[in-house]
Design a protein with these regions (language model features):
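Secondary-structure capping and domain/repeat boundary segments
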Residues: 1-206
């Protein structure tokens, strides 16, 4: 940015998934920059961020593993029930989530507390393991499985949930172990439009 001596600069606050904006600083220093004050010299400025913390609540009935945050700002939490218990779901900041199974991947938008919900296993009942889009869910024999939210994949259209090549009906009682997978259809490419947009942008910049 070019600014006249003594003027201020309006700068939009940048964002980074999984992080809080911590301010603008002179590059290589701990000197904060306040753009509401008049600018009187050249500056080389960088934005800095603080990573949100994800804390697991300890339980006597199982354990939780919290991954490192990836480049997309995602954190993966994995629950493992102790013998005699089954995993039933997640609570995030004390509230139940729509996430059905484990592991659970999400982008924190603030410092977050994650708790795994466990249930004591009834030895008189039969349970089945259902893997749905990589998440493991334990379902009692004869019960149905809640349909999860439709997954999103960039450049693709979600067309349904499938088991062994056939679309799965979530009203079907679970009577055995299952692997349910999301199926997608590739959307038409728009390279031509993208190229035109880039050329238009370059023209404006010149």
């Amino acid at each position: 940015h070019k600014v006249k001596d003594g003027e201020t600069l309006t700068v939009e606050e940048p964002s980074k998934p999984g992080h809080a904006f911590a301010g603008f600083y002179l590059v290589g220093t701990d000197t904060a920059v306040d753009f509401t004050k008049p600018i009187t010299s050249d500056m080389n400025v960088e934005s800095r961020f603080t990573q949100y913390k994800v804390t697991a609540v300890e339980s006597e009935n199982g354990t939780i593993t919290v991954s490192e945050m990836n480049d997309k700002g995602e954190v993966t939490v994995t629950a493992k029930a102790n013998d005699g218990y089954i995993f039933k779901g997640w609570k995030v900041d004390g509230k139940e989530t729509e996430a059905l199974g484990t592991p659970y991947t999400f982008v924190p938008v603030k410092d977050t507390t994650v708790e795994a919900v466990y249930e004591k296993k009834d030895d008189t009942k039969v349970y089945h393991t259902v893997i749905i889009n990589g998440q493991t869910v334990t379902v009692e024999d004869g019960k149905t499985l809640d349909r999860p939210a439709d997954p999103v994949k960039e450049g693709y259209k979600f067309i349904g949930w499938f088991v062994d090549g056939k679309e799965f009906d979530f009203n079907t009682p679970i009577t055995g172990d299952l692997k349910i997978e999301a199926r997608f259809e590739k959307l038409p490419t728009t390279d031509k439009n993208d190229k035109n947009d880039k050329n238009h942008l370059q023209t404006l910049l010149h």
